[in-house]
Amino acid sequence: MPRRRRRRRAAPGGQVPPELRLAYGARALTLGRAVFSLLPSPRHCESPCPACRGRVASGCLACRRWEHLLRDGDPVAYRRLITRAVCAIAADDLSAPPPPRYTPGNSGHSQARLVREMMKSIVADQSHGTKNVLCNGLHEGGQSICISDLVSSSSWSILLHRIGDLLMCYLLRCTSIFLPVKKNDYFQVSGVPLNVVLRNPIFASTVARKHQPQTTKAKCHTCYLWKSANMAENLSICHDSSNSGVNSSFSSTCKIVTQQSCETCGSIRRAESKDPSEGCNCPKFPSDGRSGECCNCYTHNTRKRKRLYSWQRRSKKKQVCSVDESSAEWSKLNGSNFNMSNGPSENLAGKMNDQAQSVELTVDNTSLARSNDDSSSEIKVINATILSSEKSPCSVFDIRGSQGLSCHYSLSEVQYQSTCPQVGPSSYLHLNSCSICFNCIISNASKHLSLDSLISRNGIFYNRRTTYSVFHCKHILSKRKRPDALSLVKHIFGINSCCASLLKYNCHESTIRKSNCLCCWLPKSIKNLIRNSKRCQYKKLFLKHCSVKCKVAPDVTKNDGKAHYPPGGKAAYYDRSFSRLEAYSTHQQVASFVWAVLKRIVPKPLLGNSFGKRSLRTNIWKFIKLRRFETFQLSDCIGDLKVSHYSWLSNIEFSNCFCSAIIGKQTGSSTSAEEQKQKNILHCWISWLFSDIVIPVVRTYFYVTERESKRYDVFYYPKSVWRDLTSNAIASLNKKNFRILRGEPRKAVRHLNCSSRVRFLPKAKDMRPLVDLRAKSKDANLNKCHLIMKKLRDEKPEMFGSSVFDYNNVHQNLSQFISSKRSQLMKKLKVYIVVADVSKAFDCVSHDMVLKMIDDAFKCDEYTVRKCSKVICNRSKNSLYRFDSNASIGNGNSIYDLSIQLSSGGGIFVDQGTICRILKEQFHHLLYEQIKCNILKIGQKYYLQQVGIAQGSKLSPNLCSLYYGHLENSVLSKFLHDSKLNAGEAFSEPEYLLMRFIDDFIFISFSLEHAQKFLNRMRRGFVFYNCYMNDSKYGFNFCAGNSEPSSNRLYRGDDGVSFMPWSGLLINCETLEIQADYTRYLDITIISTITVKMHSSTKYIHSKLCHYMRPKCHPIFYDSNINSPGTIRVNIYQAFLLCAMKFHCYIRSVSDANVSKLELLQVIKRTFRYMHSLIVRRMQDVELHYNVRPVLKLRRKETIWLGLTAYIRVLQQKQSRYKDMLTLLTAELGRYCHLGHECDTLRYAVDDSHSSMFWKFKF
């Protein structure tokens, strides 16, 4: 069934970016639609236009609309302004004036003059607090820059002529306009800055509040239980002290005590009562310190009274009814013998029973109100003696055990219940003594952990420190004062600070057996854990499970601390010492060591039974084998663990104690609630076990890092092995490039804190030092220097020689060369290619030479950098983020261009009006400090780099390209020109193509002699520049004679076609066609190149597949000017082959993903459509921004057919897992089966001989 085409919009107008849609809502419109929204609604055709009144034959904007605004023959820039620029109209509730009345024509002023006058008017009004981006670029002398130039172009002049002066002034002053800079990037030119709008309370109330979690406050149930017991005790004391008083005085006394107790429980206030002057019959009682005032009438009104919502009033009415019923039941209980009070209290209780008094308490969000009867002013009070003995004080409050984790929640209801737990006097006396049982505190006051909470792995990476203690000094197990068992219990289970004082060795032995009581068993086990952690012999366990002697080469072992060098000398010794790069511990060894430590430290019952131990060890192994950027959630720590695996946890009886009876009556607890409490205790224990035991043990004994050749796989090097590796690497660097600082220079460096930290990254045979230059003080200056150098790169590319910085530059150069040499290629002349790589390119750069090059390149006396803010939208979270970015404006005072750091993701750039001027001397000083005074901190020592530039800085690639560009211009270009003249060739057209990506050279020529001379020249090196080639990375497709290098990077597939790999590309040595280089996957596993999210949804899987396809959708692979139709389809087929392999690795890693086969099929099909659309979109972008006109000859049906064939071909190798999926894919392929029979290029693309390397991949 053919796919339906989307409807086109009737009226012109583009889409509004999501950032502006989220910030302004429906007020964000395209500029054309925004202009029409300022006009009155159109009238009927019979009535004349009120603006032009029919005097203009062609009509006006009010009556003709789009026909007047957009006309035939308008420039493309003007149409783009009307249909793609976005305008946000001011809201009605703001202080913006109404739009002016439209009148056709204008006063004859130019757009530039109108903008200048408008800027002066806005600046004059800025004293009132108004802000406008249009005036951010206004100098003190009144000269406009940047933004004013953007809104004074010829397109804006056309718009002024068609909408008039008044509407143009209103647009510039009262609206926010955003101009398209790139496909997905916009630049604000008028209105309140978008970053200021995002901080506006109005925006926060309408947008941000929807996405920020609401923090509700509720009280800790255990605290209420304890404090309510204190309140009941105060009430009972009040009875004894008021046996001779009248009922009214006793009533007022009880109310005072109740209020004071409630105030200690939390923020519970008495509601606003009637005025004391309106007939209050209560006697005055001066016990609260306010003599002469009625304590019943006195209220502390903290805020204005407001009427309750309807649902709250209905709930309040229900509570009054329930209290009436409960008062009847309490009157029955008063007649029973279940009363603990004796003496005068009993007589007082009898008197109170005859009067049938009761309390009605209602609570809303702000206050605790006492309801009075309308017919009489008599206040009903419950017998305080009965409340203190029969009714649980906890039942006064609405205790919800499922939320009792935080002490900052607010009560929603406080009421008396109609029933009370029937418990014995001894249990109540225990509660009234202000102590709660151990079980209830652990189960109700423990922190609640979500299964989605993350276990932080950042602590295990790149830790070089060697300590004698496994746990760091701030760890609870390594404090000088050994923690007691209760302190560790509070730490493990996260007991709330307000409940920590209640946790004691206390339980109700009469109701709970000692064998099942946490109070009797858990502290004893925790004591054993503390003692075992001090006595465990970690080092012996480490040497037993993680021995590396068998992996270390015998020629690198030390003998009495002295190195015995082999015949090759020190260099050969250092080369052989790097065999220790393979002396890392495997994942199984690390997991075995961690498990051995746990068995020595943790008591056996806390590890669970045999099934629990097996599951826990499996989860530890999963944690150890995670890749670099993968996350580990609490649900992954739990895995298959169950409460039944832990006898001490499954046998806890929560319902036998007095505390749990009270909570059960209030919350209606059931078996499921008790199981949830047990699970929460298990979650707290397992989370602490991983965070505070497993991670510190791994961090102490291993240096955890990734390797350059193994992508995201994580390697665990023992600290002793890593110390040897880094010492050898530092020794080699110290011998060549670095000098250690001692004495006064070291003290000065430590005082100024101007050093950069270094970490080493293992390579295949040596170590690469990476410098961290992301400190804020350095990063800001480096950003400015980077922008200035980038501007030089754009204005004077010849100073960088043949440098290319991305595939777009390669595409541009290669397309021009092939178009000029099309005739030679058609004749199938031999093409000669040479590839060379500079050895240690960054380490051999001469400081004095690169500084001299900088002096010659940067001639301007002053550079200007302008500050911008960028607002981006996170589509997955539907929220906005803002961060600062720099925009290079120009050189000196001649500032008319705007060079913004654009991004493919898109965003909104807002000019901040902040200009930073950098003088030439200041710029040279910054670069001098970066190059000559680069101080690195390795361990506890400081090193000064004497030769080379640091890797890891933004400036390093540009400085390196400038250095080798100078080498090309001064040496290589002269050499190639002289050899060409000696050969007698014409000099009109270039006979060769030279490109360089930082330090990787490629030379293409149709002359064998020319290619041989270039190869020989590169092999000799360049002594003056301290530049030599790497002998193991040469590549050439011809016979080099007797002096042929020992290695050649030429790749030849099963089809016999030779390719030259260079910078991620495979270049056909016969036709110069381009394919992607997948040879780097031959030595690694495919799964090591992906990052898996354990609990992935269908949407997330689709995003990952699209992410895998994105790098292989560059136009250089699908341009018909470079590649043949067969090669284009081979590139698509190979991209889908790799994506299918990563798809299998991802689905295999997410074994618990509940995704059906049909959903996966839809995800795969959407990936095909996404790739084709992305190819088309990037083709258009290259044509727009580069001087390249690519040609795409590819249909969507062919892309889908190639994708389905690639998935079937890959998943057939895993047939047992994807039997149903293969059936669905085959059925889907049947809809396009005619393409495979009709198109020869498709059959050529899916031939296995053209993709022979893929069948050698491990996935």
From Swiss-Prot:
Principal location class: nucleus
Protein family membership: Belongs to the reverse transcriptase family. Telomerase subfamily.
Domain Reverse transcriptase: 742-1067
The UniProt record lists the keyword Nucleus: yes
Binding annotation for Mg(2+): D837, D999, D1000
Function (record text): Telomerase is a ribonucleoprotein enzyme essential for the replication of chromosome termini in most eukaryotes. It elongates telomeres. It is a reverse transcriptase that adds simple sequence repeats to chromosome ends by copying a template sequence within the RNA component of the enzyme.
Catalytic activity: DNA(n) + a 2'-deoxyribonucleoside 5'-triphosphate = DNA(n+1) + diphosphate
Tissue spec. comment: Expressed in shoot apices and immature embryos.
GO molecular function, one term: metal ion binding
Domain of life of the organism encoding this protein: Eukaryota
GO CC list: chromosome, telomeric region; telomerase catalytic core complex
Record carries keyword Signal: no
Localisation: Nucleus; Chromosome, Telomere
Subunit structure: Component of the telomerase ribonucleoprotein complex.
Pfam families in alphabetical order: Telomerase_RBD, TERT_C
Cysteines paired by S-S bonds: none
Biological process according to GO: telomere maintenance via telomerase
Organism: Oryza sativa subsp. japonica (Rice)
Key words, A-Z: Chromosome, DNA-binding, Magnesium, Metal-binding, Nucleotidyltransferase, Nucleus, RNA-directed DNA polymerase, Telomere, Transferase
Protein name according to UniProt: Telomerase reverse transcriptase
EC id: 2.7.7.49
